[in-house]
């Protein structure tokens, strides 16, 4: 077993055991969880309610004056309301950057910061002693600074570190009481600086941050400081603003400690206003969010039937989320983490989102389990189903947090610390508290259901003991199977609120969005934060990488002389470092001219150049101090609690007040190696290791390179620095990481078969509860369908038009049904005929056939018997007019005539009527004049082809009896109320008779109005009257079987087996009488197709013939929107114009024969073939729009909606595709043999067939809405074909029977 599977199995087993534990002992677990919550929230008792971050307002330094005490109502500027009166203090910071230059390889790691820190004492003394001498007075720092008194009583440990009873001036010198002697005698500076640091994690202001004035990681006080630059500030709090004094102090410090490449462009004063710490109003959005959360969960769970207490579950969810927030903040406070502006405000809302989604996931998983299981098993199974996904999401989130923490960006690290605590606490509460509460609620639901099911007798108290009575007790009724009705079920489609809930629970969209947003946020901060990766790489490359190298000459950079750092600038040309271009642009013109002149002088004196290079062996590398825009507002990198914490030590509150932060004063200090040696403590040489000894001593490499450069001064050598290679490797690693990250994100968000094989859940089976994604099994019901019986063989063809349904079986019998009542209206041929195995009809009695053609009309007409097959020969009197319409065939009250058929017929014609009888002369004369060919029993109807292939039959009154076949001739049997005459114009060549048609199979069928068009295997095309069962027209020109036909309006197009097509037009010689067939009695449905009267003479005129439409048999034929589309075994699809049979396009795109075609009035064309592919085509241009592979066999049927394409195949799979993107949305696995049984009731409702059942699906969502079983399922047959009627009914083909099923009304309303 693979490692992943083993891990997954162990996780599932652990969650299953945990679910059993929570459901078995709910009360102890809830009590234990409550104690854990209270213990975690205990630190919150000492924490005030969180306020909001400070607000800033910026003004210019030039002409600054403090605002008035009261706001001016006439002032319409944009200054805030709080900007009134003097601030609590004006903060002036002197930012110091100190570096040892040049650096010697023998220096210790502690030398990086000991000597720079030693310079803070004279700097502080210089600031304290600065005096501004004016004409009339002198002003010192004591006159303008903020005077403070004692510290708070609880800060005794800070008494010797923070100033008291004097100016509020802070610097690193406060660690040693501003005494340089204590500093020099301190053997361990790191221990002294960190002795008051909290042992726990801390993000708020610490003593080190207060005194250094910069974040601890940027101070450079570390044994592994590769930059060798130490930064700290001297912070001065001023009581009033004196611009003259501050300008003089700035000028003096710049003069004494010049910062040559510092722009100091900031000329603004930032006023920072701090809101009230306890802000109840600030908590209103968060409280509102939790109220909305409670209401949303309640209204969502109202639609979940398996939850007993909706209020209780919603309350438990809110308590879970709120407890998770409180536990997170409490644990963070316990470990020294306090919410800050960046992480604290959004954190409660992230907890709400993540907690809500986890609640939905657990609820959905548990209520999706089978209801017949025990409660603890349901809880355990629900947890097991979601265990892998919960742990996978948890691991992904922790991995992202871990990566973010090691970016070393303070804001990201702080957020990651909060996120870890929040995720762990939320996971704890979800697993222990909410799961246990959910088990209690489901157990209450189960008990309530049991109480409802207890019979009334069980509630009767037991009788009192007394005399035994032996009366007969009534037997209990056995449990009988019941039918689930739609009224007792929940809504077939889930409500929108639950669909949204389960959508978030199924996809975990919120957590994935948060994870993606966190990654993007971390990436942005890494590359934009002043302390981020971008600045690190810039400084690192600037300090150690030779830009240009051998490609371009090194640009001279002026630096301070090592012997005299305070003296004038001298041009020194370091070969091991280059200056940033922006720093070079900041030099004055004099420096550039001096550099260029020095360069020219060096080129003209190569001997001096060699000497200078030899001297640089000792001066290994100068570290240049750079100043950037991020240094102008270093205070922004501090915690927003920095200033309130500082002033709170002196009992000064900043709530509802503001402070003004002045532009900083830059100071650059360069320390010589001699100063480093003088400041070193004797004990440090024994305990400290050389600088960067563990990192490979890069300075030795520099020394070797410089030595080689001195030996070969004529060669342009570049120091062997690998920083560029490190940067390149880091960039390559970042690129690989991004590629892998986006790949994993793709695999996480997108399914494995995205764009090819549909969604990840694959095929949906009815047995596997296809609605499991939403937690519900589809409702099932059983109804008694309207069964249409009558066929003795399997049904092969089905057709419908409005209220009529036509079916044809393999025996060639055509039946016309009423789609509303299920009554059989007409049988073609008549029900008294049946076909032998050879295909010819015979009598159903036992009279013996004779080898000769003899016929007794009275006997046949009276008894309605069928003839057996006899030898075909020309009938008698075939050249005489048919006078059968003159015979009264109502023999029910007359004795049968025993004479022979031929003599009786002749005597009936020649017999003169009695004087008192009826005169038939006028009627006989009319018959002779019309020259109609007899269609009576033994007289053949010669259907010779006309010059244009026209053949006509005229029917008289309405037929009541079916037609029969005698001796190979087609005839119709009449009653007294009917007379029929036949007419066929054309040549005298014999044509096939009706019996020939009956002996051939029906290959295709079409119905429109009251006309049925039949295409037979022998090539004959017949038009029948669906109501009377009479043949209205027949065309016998075809020599090849009709594989398919289209009956559209008055046009009939037939496709033949040899690949040809014939276009016919149906017309009538009389005006059409648009009768309205109303189906069965008491029906009022009117079909839209034209209905012809029995008096109409229907003509079938062939208008066009396409001799070679395809090179192989035509297997598919569809017509719509004036276009005719054909598909053939030659792998092509052709589009014809219906009106003139003109071929417009030949479409090639299949590698197999075409098996299915779909086209509608919107000219949407789809084709499917034996290769299992589906192609979508543009009918107007003939181009292929999309190509989809979705079946392992032939595509049997195609359907299209406005947004989907539905295909089915021989693999018994129904695939639903997105029409615009050609992406498979989902698949439906059908029962064996039911792959092609599907139909569209509407664009949103699909019906499919199964073993003795039909199922209704939501096309848009793939939900199984309902399964309807048609009778018993033990001996059920597969539904092979489904035909959707216009009256909200469907017809299912179950072998030789048809089942008429009406769509449930709930589904109609749903659609």
UniProtKB/Swiss-Prot annotation:
Q: Name one Pfam family in it.
A: Beta-prop_SCAP
Can you say where in the cell this protein is located?
A: Endoplasmic reticulum membrane; Golgi apparatus membrane; Cytoplasmic vesicle, COPII-coated vesicle membrane
* MF GO annotations: sterol binding
* Keyword field contains Glycoprotein: yes
Cross-referenced PROSITE patterns: SSD, WD_REPEATS_1, WD_REPEATS_2, WD_REPEATS_REGION
State the residue spans of region: Interaction with srebf.
747-1311
Q: Where is the SSD domain?
A: 282-440
- Kindly report every residue range on the membrane side named Cytoplasmic: 1-18, 299-310, 364-399, 443-512, 745-1311
WD repeat start and end residues: 790-827, 997-1034, 1037-1076, 1109-1146, 1149-1187, 1190-1227, 1230-1267
UniProt motif (ER export signal) ranges: 445-450
Q: What cellular component GO annotations does this protein have?
A: endoplasmic reticulum membrane; ER to Golgi transport vesicle membrane; Golgi membrane; SREBP-SCAP complex
Give the multimer and partner information: Membrane region forms a homotetramer. Component of the SCAP-SREBP complex (composed of SCAP and srebf1/srebp1 or srebf2/srebp2). Forms a ternary complex with insig1 or insig2 through its transmembrane domains at high sterol concentrations. Interacts with the SEC23-SEC24 complex.
Q: Which PANTHER family match?
A: STEROL REGULATORY ELEMENT-BINDING PROTEIN CLEAVAGE-ACTIVATING PROTEIN (PTHR46378:SF1)
Protein name, please?
A: Sterol regulatory element-binding protein cleavage-activating protein
Q: Which organism is it from?
A: Xenopus laevis
Q: What is the lineage of its organism?
A: Eukaryota, Metazoa, Chordata, Craniata, Vertebrata
Gene designation per UniProt? scap
